[in-house]
Amino acid sequence: MKKNHKLIAILSIYILLLGCENKREALGADNELIVVCADPDKDIIYDFVQSVFDDTLFTPQPEPYFKIRFVKPEGYIDLKEQAYVVVGAIGDDIHNDGVKLIKKLLPEEQYQSTLENDPILFTHDLYASNQLFLIVNAKSRDQLMASVPAKKEWLKNQYYSQFAKRQSKYIFENARRVEVEKELSEKNGWTMKIPWGWEVIKDSSDVGFFWIGKEMPFQWVSIQWEDGKTIDVVDGLDIGNTIWSYPETFYEHIRFHDYKFKMEKGYFNRIKAWKISGIWESIEEPQGGPFLSYIFYDKASDKTYHLNMLIYHPGEDKSIFMRQMDLIAKSFRVTKWV
């Protein structure tokens, strides 16, 4: 583990030079990677980025969590304050504009070290606040791709944590439906952060169901709960039956489809949970889109909870909205205990 962390080198010289400056907030979208490299290196750098950031939302068409925007080295100066910047080069050809750029960015000793040893350099807040900056400087494709297994999960965690930090500030800090949040806590013993613009579609707390939504695009988040441990946390068949019956029971006019249906064990806010994802479709109209659910038992409140999210946004990007809803769902917390 120590060795792996050592592989993620820090651009110390720039931190020393720039660390005392007051930096403005990083620019750009939270689902876009700015990748700066010369044309001959694009395919290799693309394969590296794709192999690290391989999470995909099926809508049902595949939609990556991060879009890749390639920029030639001469455009670097105008985009260096973007939120997610990757600067890459393969080989040491001094006529390669990407190599020229990296040689300007790195001290000679560090430049040679990346070619001979670890090809990845990573840091935070280099030119802007809440920025992630990655340098990829490899001698060859083989050297670069060989570095992926040791770094993949660590790098993904850095980027996903930064996404959560920046997006939480965007969706929660300006205004929230605090009165609804307080009512949920007092009435149901749990609450969650509800951003301004989200409306209560249905409050059936007497039977353990609460549903909020937002337009432009259409987004739904619902919570269903029951007293006691009503699921078998080990038996996937039991969870599957719970999921398949959910939309027709609580939404009535939609159902889940078996295309790209996926169930996996994991955690929801440090509680063991099932994570279920797939595609929903309307029973009445040609409509559909992605959904995501978490099912878990909370021992402190002695209740089983099911949080479900779905979106309808035909022909447009959906992944960033699904990830925003995931942040809303994960703001869920129990406020009353047994």
Say what each PLM segment does:
Residues 28-67, 173-202:
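N-terminal "mature-domain start" segment
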Residues 34-40, 55-59, 69-74, 195-254:
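Secretory pathway targeting signatures of secreted, lumenal, and periplasmic proteins
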Residues 21-23:
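Bacterial signal peptide processing site
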Residues 75-82, 88-138, 142, 246-302, ...:
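Signature of long, low-cysteine stretches enriched in small and polar/charged residues
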Residues 145-169, 198, 304-338:
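Surface-exposed amphipathic alpha-helical segments
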Residues 1-8:
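Bacterial N-terminal signal peptides that target proteins for export
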Residues 9-14:
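Hydrophobic helical h-region of N-terminal Sec-dependent signal peptides
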Residues 16-19:
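C-terminal motif of bacterial Sec signal peptides marking the signal peptidase cleavage site
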